[in-house]
């Protein structure tokens, strides 16, 4: 038992603060290495433009692919053994893998370690499950919205810090620094997260069929998983072409990388500001209204992005898009809380993470394919169509949920 654990009631607000810090540290740790990932691939012996692009894409995507496979297993284990244990397992496991990445000698070793990183991940979904099972239901939207800003903040600061560290100390030391950040996350979680959890034997665990039947509305929960996937597809589809699109808009300027970095970052800043506020509003008026409104608002912003003429116009639209995006995943997570029990929260949030990871893999592939065949501007129009489908699909699923309530 950690020093912070005793017989006193759990202070969920303190747990929220510590979990936020953990999500911030893991978000920063994951994104620290992103700016120079292709450079490290090249350092490991990959040469040639096409080979470098291919391997960079593979080592980036494989982490999400293996995370989507492993998440349900870790979610089930969290429901059996406790969410805090899964937070500790994830932070320590990822820290060890980061050290090994810094020692990799060839691309195959690095590829295997990136896959292992995905297998051992899962800090954020388990943090979501932990907080969701402790926070009062009428504060779920605010709490999960606030928690989401931890990972966003870390992901925003990570690339800047990673780039500076790589320039100052070289590529390999950044992996060791990242590992130390994850180990710090491990100790913060160990000593300051409290959870009263009664372990459940494997025989007493609900099987998949029982998990489904225990849900208040299984079809709605599945539709929320699909909504999460589409949100990530829409977000990821723009990532591969953003820098090239900015270069096309900016023309012959010397600081395209800086401008692209700023435009890539502004949605995260906006989400950071909007997520807790819109989460709190969702607690008052209903997360389903926030979800549908934010999706429609996103469509209305994506369409004009295809017609902008300057980087400034694109940056303003992406800032507004980030404000809407900051409400989407917390609204989905709040609806999942409303429609599942604490007994299966770990698995529900992990299944949702699997769909999110699949979206992280397929989104960039979709964006790259569309831009290669139809140009950069078409990506925004197709993405707007995908999000519009998501809005209609989500509205229909949520509307069907309300019909029985009215008839009853």
Swiss-Prot record:
GO biological-process terms attached to the record: response to antibiotic
Keyword Cytoplasm carried by entry: no
Residue spans crossing the bilayer: 16-36, 58-78, 92-112, 115-135, 146-166, 173-193, 224-244, 256-276, 290-310, 319-339, 378-398
Keyword set includes Acetylation: no
Protein purpose: Confers resistance to fosfomycin and deoxycholate.
Any one annotated GO CC term: plasma membrane
Protein name listed in UniProt: Multidrug resistance protein MdtG
UniProtKB keywords: Antibiotic resistance, Cell inner membrane, Cell membrane, Membrane, Transmembrane, Transmembrane helix, Transport
Membrane-topology annotation of the record: Multi-pass membrane protein
UniProt superkingdom: Bacteria
InterPro entries listed in its UniProt record: MFS (IPR011701), MFS_dom (IPR020846), MFS_MdtG_subfamily (IPR050497), MFS_trans_sf (IPR036259), Mutidrug-R_MdtG (IPR023692), Tet-R_TetA/multi-R_MdtG-like (IPR001958)
GO molecular function term, any single one: transmembrane transporter activity
HAMAP family in alphabetical order: MFS_MdtG
Subcellular location: Cell inner membrane
Family statement drawn from the similarity comment of this UniProt entry: Belongs to the major facilitator superfamily. DHA1 family. MdtG (TC 2.A.1.2.20) subfamily.
